[in-house]
A protein has these predicted regions:
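A short, glycine/small-residue-rich beta-strand->loop->alpha-helix junction that serves as a flexible
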Residues: 1-6, 27-29
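N-terminal strand-loop element at the rim of the active site
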Residues: 11, 16-70, 158
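Acceptor-binding helix/loop patch of EC 2.4 sugar-transfer enzymes
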Residues: 56-73, 120-138
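Short His-centered aromatic/hydrophobic patch
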Residues: 81, 99-105, 122
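Membrane-proximal helix-turn-helix segments that form the acceptor-binding/catalytic region
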Residues: 83-92, 134-153
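A short helix->loop->beta-strand "cap" motif at the edges of active sites that frequently abuts
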Residues: 114-118, 148-149, 169-172
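Carbohydrate-associated surface elements
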Residues: 157, 176-179
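A short helix/loop element that forms part of the nucleotide-sugar donor recognition site in Leloir-type
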Residues: 185-187
Length: 187
Protein backbone atom coordinates (compact mmCIF):
# COMPACT_ATOMS: atom_id res chain seq x y z
CA UNK A 1 0.00 0.00 0.00
CA UNK A 2 2.88 2.38 0.75
CA UNK A 3 4.23 2.16 -2.81
CA UNK A 4 0.81 2.89 -4.27
CA UNK A 5 0.38 5.86 -1.92
CA UNK A 6 3.69 7.33 -3.07
CA UNK A 7 2.65 6.77 -6.69
CA UNK A 8 -0.69 8.48 -6.19
CA UNK A 9 0.91 11.43 -4.41
CA UNK A 10 3.33 11.87 -7.31
CA UNK A 11 0.40 11.84 -9.77
CA UNK A 12 -1.51 14.63 -7.98
CA UNK A 13 -1.37 18.31 -8.84
CA UNK A 14 0.14 19.39 -5.52
CA UNK A 15 -0.33 23.06 -6.35
CA UNK A 16 -4.12 22.79 -6.47
CA UNK A 17 -4.64 21.80 -2.81
CA UNK A 18 -2.59 21.45 0.37
CA UNK A 19 -1.97 17.77 1.06
CA UNK A 20 -0.90 16.35 4.39
CA UNK A 21 0.11 12.85 5.41
CA UNK A 22 -0.63 11.74 8.95
CA UNK A 23 0.98 8.67 10.45
CA UNK A 24 1.89 7.21 13.79
CA UNK A 25 5.48 8.21 14.52
CA UNK A 26 6.46 4.76 15.70
CA UNK A 27 5.75 3.38 12.20
CA UNK A 28 8.51 5.45 10.62
CA UNK A 29 10.95 5.50 13.53
CA UNK A 30 12.87 2.49 12.21
CA UNK A 31 12.62 3.60 8.55
CA UNK A 32 12.87 7.41 8.40
CA UNK A 33 13.94 7.16 4.74
CA UNK A 34 10.28 6.54 3.89
CA UNK A 35 9.61 10.22 4.51
CA UNK A 36 12.22 11.19 1.91
CA UNK A 37 10.04 9.63 -0.80
CA UNK A 38 7.22 12.11 -0.19
CA UNK A 39 6.94 14.67 -2.97
CA UNK A 40 7.86 18.28 -2.21
CA UNK A 41 4.83 20.20 -1.04
CA UNK A 42 3.24 17.38 0.97
CA UNK A 43 2.99 18.33 4.64
CA UNK A 44 3.12 15.89 7.52
CA UNK A 45 1.15 15.51 10.74
CA UNK A 46 2.93 12.86 12.82
CA UNK A 47 0.84 11.32 15.60
CA UNK A 48 3.44 11.12 18.34
CA UNK A 49 1.44 9.99 21.35
CA UNK A 50 -0.75 7.04 22.16
CA UNK A 51 -4.37 7.34 23.20
CA UNK A 52 -5.10 7.87 26.87
CA UNK A 53 -8.15 5.96 28.08
CA UNK A 54 -9.69 5.56 31.49
CA UNK A 55 -11.02 2.18 32.62
CA UNK A 56 -14.58 2.85 31.45
CA UNK A 57 -13.39 3.88 27.99
CA UNK A 58 -11.20 0.77 27.79
CA UNK A 59 -14.23 -1.34 28.71
CA UNK A 60 -16.32 0.45 26.07
CA UNK A 61 -13.61 -0.20 23.47
CA UNK A 62 -13.46 -3.89 24.32
CA UNK A 63 -17.25 -4.18 24.11
CA UNK A 64 -17.23 -2.46 20.72
CA UNK A 65 -14.54 -4.74 19.33
CA UNK A 66 -16.63 -7.74 20.41
CA UNK A 67 -19.78 -6.29 18.84
CA UNK A 68 -21.57 -5.64 22.14
CA UNK A 69 -21.43 -1.86 22.32
CA UNK A 70 -24.49 -0.01 23.55
CA UNK A 71 -25.37 3.67 23.37
CA UNK A 72 -23.43 4.61 26.55
CA UNK A 73 -20.25 2.96 25.28
CA UNK A 74 -20.64 4.38 21.76
CA UNK A 75 -21.10 7.87 23.23
CA UNK A 76 -18.06 7.41 25.47
CA UNK A 77 -15.88 6.21 22.56
CA UNK A 78 -16.99 8.97 20.19
CA UNK A 79 -16.17 11.53 22.89
CA UNK A 80 -12.75 9.94 23.46
CA UNK A 81 -11.89 9.90 19.75
CA UNK A 82 -13.13 13.48 19.23
CA UNK A 83 -10.75 14.44 22.05
CA UNK A 84 -7.98 12.53 20.23
CA UNK A 85 -8.79 14.43 17.03
CA UNK A 86 -8.40 17.75 18.86
CA UNK A 87 -5.17 16.56 20.52
CA UNK A 88 -3.53 15.69 17.20
CA UNK A 89 -4.99 18.28 14.82
CA UNK A 90 -6.18 21.12 17.07
CA UNK A 91 -8.34 23.59 15.21
CA UNK A 92 -6.87 22.80 11.79
CA UNK A 93 -9.60 22.74 9.18
CA UNK A 94 -9.42 20.08 6.49
CA UNK A 95 -11.60 19.97 3.38
CA UNK A 96 -11.61 16.17 3.70
CA UNK A 97 -9.69 13.28 5.25
CA UNK A 98 -8.75 10.00 3.62
CA UNK A 99 -8.00 6.83 5.55
CA UNK A 100 -5.81 5.53 2.77
CA UNK A 101 -4.66 2.14 3.98
CA UNK A 102 -8.07 1.18 5.43
CA UNK A 103 -6.49 -0.83 8.24
CA UNK A 104 -5.66 -0.16 11.88
CA UNK A 105 -8.42 0.25 14.42
CA UNK A 106 -7.09 3.45 15.99
CA UNK A 107 -6.86 5.37 12.73
CA UNK A 108 -10.23 4.08 11.54
CA UNK A 109 -11.94 5.30 14.72
CA UNK A 110 -9.96 8.56 14.85
CA UNK A 111 -10.79 9.63 11.30
CA UNK A 112 -14.41 8.66 11.83
CA UNK A 113 -14.58 11.69 14.16
CA UNK A 114 -13.12 14.15 11.64
CA UNK A 115 -15.35 17.22 11.30
CA UNK A 116 -15.23 17.07 7.49
CA UNK A 117 -16.05 14.56 4.73
CA UNK A 118 -14.27 11.22 5.32
CA UNK A 119 -13.16 8.57 2.85
CA UNK A 120 -11.86 5.09 3.56
CA UNK A 121 -10.01 3.10 0.92
CA UNK A 122 -10.35 -0.64 0.46
CA UNK A 123 -7.26 -2.34 -0.99
CA UNK A 124 -8.20 -5.96 -0.20
CA UNK A 125 -11.22 -8.15 0.45
CA UNK A 126 -11.61 -7.05 4.05
CA UNK A 127 -14.03 -9.87 4.90
CA UNK A 128 -11.30 -12.37 3.99
CA UNK A 129 -8.70 -10.30 5.85
CA UNK A 130 -10.84 -10.40 9.00
CA UNK A 131 -11.59 -14.13 8.78
CA UNK A 132 -8.23 -15.44 7.55
CA UNK A 133 -5.69 -13.03 9.03
CA UNK A 134 -7.56 -11.35 11.87
CA UNK A 135 -5.73 -8.11 11.10
CA UNK A 136 -8.82 -5.91 11.35
CA UNK A 137 -12.00 -5.94 13.42
CA UNK A 138 -15.27 -6.75 11.62
CA UNK A 139 -17.40 -4.65 13.98
CA UNK A 140 -15.17 -1.62 13.55
CA UNK A 141 -15.15 -2.00 9.77
CA UNK A 142 -18.92 -2.31 9.65
CA UNK A 143 -19.28 0.93 11.59
CA UNK A 144 -16.69 2.66 9.39
CA UNK A 145 -18.39 1.54 6.18
CA UNK A 146 -21.69 2.86 7.57
CA UNK A 147 -20.36 6.22 8.78
CA UNK A 148 -17.58 7.31 6.42
CA UNK A 149 -18.93 9.48 3.62
CA UNK A 150 -17.06 7.66 0.85
CA UNK A 151 -15.85 4.08 0.50
CA UNK A 152 -13.17 3.71 -2.16
CA UNK A 153 -12.28 0.19 -3.30
CA UNK A 154 -9.36 -0.04 -5.73
CA UNK A 155 -11.12 -2.56 -7.98
CA UNK A 156 -14.65 -3.61 -8.86
CA UNK A 157 -14.28 -7.06 -7.29
CA UNK A 158 -13.93 -5.45 -3.85
CA UNK A 159 -17.40 -3.85 -3.97
CA UNK A 160 -19.38 -7.03 -3.31
CA UNK A 161 -17.65 -8.00 -0.03
CA UNK A 162 -18.00 -4.45 1.33
CA UNK A 163 -21.73 -4.45 0.56
CA UNK A 164 -22.64 -8.05 1.43
CA UNK A 165 -20.36 -8.64 4.43
CA UNK A 166 -20.46 -5.19 6.01
CA UNK A 167 -23.74 -3.75 4.73
CA UNK A 168 -22.22 -0.69 3.10
CA UNK A 169 -24.48 1.61 1.11
CA UNK A 170 -23.66 1.06 -2.57
CA UNK A 171 -24.34 4.74 -3.35
CA UNK A 172 -21.33 5.79 -1.23
CA UNK A 173 -18.91 3.49 -3.07
CA UNK A 174 -16.65 4.79 -5.82
CA UNK A 175 -13.94 2.63 -7.39
CA UNK A 176 -10.60 4.36 -7.93
CA UNK A 177 -7.95 2.12 -9.44
CA UNK A 178 -4.42 2.19 -8.10
CA UNK A 179 -2.04 4.58 -9.78
CA UNK A 180 1.45 3.39 -10.60
CA UNK A 181 4.36 5.81 -10.87
CA UNK A 182 5.87 4.40 -14.05
CA UNK A 183 8.42 7.25 -14.23
CA UNK A 184 10.23 6.15 -11.08
CA UNK A 185 10.19 2.54 -12.32
CA UNK A 186 11.80 3.63 -15.60
CA UNK A 187 14.44 5.62 -13.71
Amino acid sequence: ITTVLYSQLHALDLTRYNYFISFRSLYVKDHPERMERLPDGVGIYPLASEMNMDLLTIAAQLLKLKGHAGSWSECRLHTAYRREWKKHFGSTEFACVIHYNGYEAYTTALLEEAPCPRSIWVHNDMAKEVHLKGNMNAHLLKEAYHTYDHIVPVSEDLIQPVVSEFGADRSRITVIHNCHDFQSVLE
